[in-house]
């Protein structure tokens, strides 16, 4: 251990860790944490490599051996925290994950945008959420950080190089998704029959 703080949003949970805090409601605690069953969109379950399956099963049987580092600081939307001599504001940005968190330094105009906004690719939008429309939630989060406009001078992503004009990149990502949705509508109209997510993917890629 290094003693470094691990900062997360207040709702952060490790879905495969049965040793998470006791404040989780009974229904959630009773729900299997590993996505071996049906997917949220109704298709067949994931087929994981045997090594990965053994890891997940081991983590539930021997939690002390597989325990992930615990967050030491949990932040709510709009909370401020001092890091490395800078004052950062927490921005909750559900989309890639339900508990994704960005940090903004208004004095220097620096946005730590993590996996929320990436410069050359679009983040995966998780279906492992209670949100009935996670893509809409992602769009709302893009609008939230995009609204900072020129206040953001530089954005630091989790993948790729630092980039400028965060608001423009947010618009580009939304346009990409809208284009994909339009293509799905065309496919649905042409085939005129129900399709699974897997079948739709075959027409998209």
Regions found by a protein language model. Name each.
Residues 1-82, 169-171:
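Active-site HxH/HxHxD metal-binding segment of metal-dependent hydrolases
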Residues 2-4, 106-108, 193:
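Short glycine/proline-enriched coil/turn segments at helix->beta-strand junctions
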Residues 21, 147-150, 193:
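Generic structural signal for secondary-structure transition and capping sites
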Residues 191-205:
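Short acidic, hydrophobic short linear motifs in intrinsically disordered regions
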Residues 50-73, 87-181, 187:
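Metallo-beta-lactamase
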């Amino acid at each position: 251990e290094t003693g470094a703080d691990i900062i997360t949003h207040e709702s952060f949970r490790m879905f495969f860790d049965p040793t998470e805090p006791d404040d989780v409601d009974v229904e959630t605690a009773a729900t299997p944490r590993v996505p071996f069953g049906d997917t949220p969109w109704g298709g067949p379950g994931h087929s994981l490599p045997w090594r990965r399956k053994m890891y997940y099963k081991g983590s539930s049987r021997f939690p002390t051996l597989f325990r992930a580092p615990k967050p030491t600081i949990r932040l709510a939307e709009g909370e401020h925290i001092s890091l490395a001599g800078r004052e950062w504001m927490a921005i909750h940005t559900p989309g890639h994950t339900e508990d994704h968190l960005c940090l903004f330094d208004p004095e220097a105009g620096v946005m730590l945008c993590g996996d929320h906004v990436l410069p050359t690719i679009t983040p995966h939008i998780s279906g492992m959420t209670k949100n009935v429309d996670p893509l809409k939630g992602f769009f709302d989060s893009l609008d939230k950080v995009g609204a900072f406009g020129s206040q953001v001078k530089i954005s630091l992503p989790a993948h790729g190089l630092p980039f400028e004009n965060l608001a423009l990149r947010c618009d580009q990502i939304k346009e990409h998704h809208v284009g994909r949705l339009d293509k799905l509508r065309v496919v649905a109209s042409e085939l005129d029959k129900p399709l699974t997510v897997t079948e739709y993917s075959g027409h998209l890629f």
